[in-house]
Amino acid sequence: DTLRIARQRMEAGRPLVPDSADMVHVRCGEDIRHSLKVAGFAGAFVEFSDPYCQGPVPRLDRAAFLDKRSEFIVSGYDRSLKDARDRLEAEYGAVDALGEGDRVVLWFEHDSYDQLILARLLAHFSRLDERPDLQMICVGEVPGVQGFVGLGQLHPEVLLWLWENELKPVTEGQLALGAEVWNAVTDPDPTELDRIVRDGTPALPLMAPALRRHLRELPSARTGLGLTQALSLSILARADGQKLTAGRIFQALMTRHELLPFLGDLMFW
């Protein structure tokens, strides 16, 4: 694929290397790391994947915040406390190291997992006096891709298409909105987050729908259940006594019931 894509770019008169070696690609997971290499990208790759859509996101100083996040990750995933903390320290440290003179591209999609991480990154960069050159690809759909869920499902050639057609500079308005959203996310009272959703987020159009879905994970006043819990129980109730594995419940949830999928299988378990 790498040679074929390179040949096609040569024939089209496009540069073989879309970016440059001094560029840094930031993504909330590793799902496009290999595809970027196949597509010919030469820049460094930074993963920043603390899943804010789950667990406590308290308004604390960095050390205490990472303590809380590490404890949650250990409770929900098969990791030791040291491994969880070391990984978070490495990811946060890699982002903190980006500053003036760096060229950074943020790769994100439309679900609450991505958008909450995007908000945190924008909030972080908004506070810097010496800020890197920031660009972003943030999409909720891709022409010709039916059932688009995320960037990780895309062929390297489609990532190149996004690079050439969807790459845009990050604006001051987007940085300010990211800071506003992150401040609301870390507030134990969801009132401000709900206001942001109701007012809309024109600077980041995909943010408001993702935040709306995130708020629906809060316990319902009527049932005490978050939406994922309620949908999962609904799937079981419709099984007519048939035994369903967690895998089948997750598949049904993601393909037939969840309007804005954001959970991976490990996150669901």
List PLM regions with ranges.
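A structured, charge-rich N-terminal accessory region that forms the first stable segment of a protein
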Residues: R4-L81
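Gly/Ser/Thr-rich loops at beta-strand to alpha-helix junctions
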Residues: R27-R33, H110-L118, V142
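A short alpha->loop->secondary-structure connector
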Residues: A42-F45, R120-L134
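Long, hydrophobic/aromatic-enriched structural stretches that serve as scaffold segments
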Residues: G76-R127
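Short, conserved secondary-structure transition motifs
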Residues: M136-L160
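A conserved mid-domain beta-alpha-beta active-site/ligand-binding segment of alpha/beta enzyme cores
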Residues: P156-R238
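Short acidic, hydrophobic short linear motifs in intrinsically disordered regions
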Residues: G241-T255, G264
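Short amphipathic alpha-helical interaction segments
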Residues: L260-W269
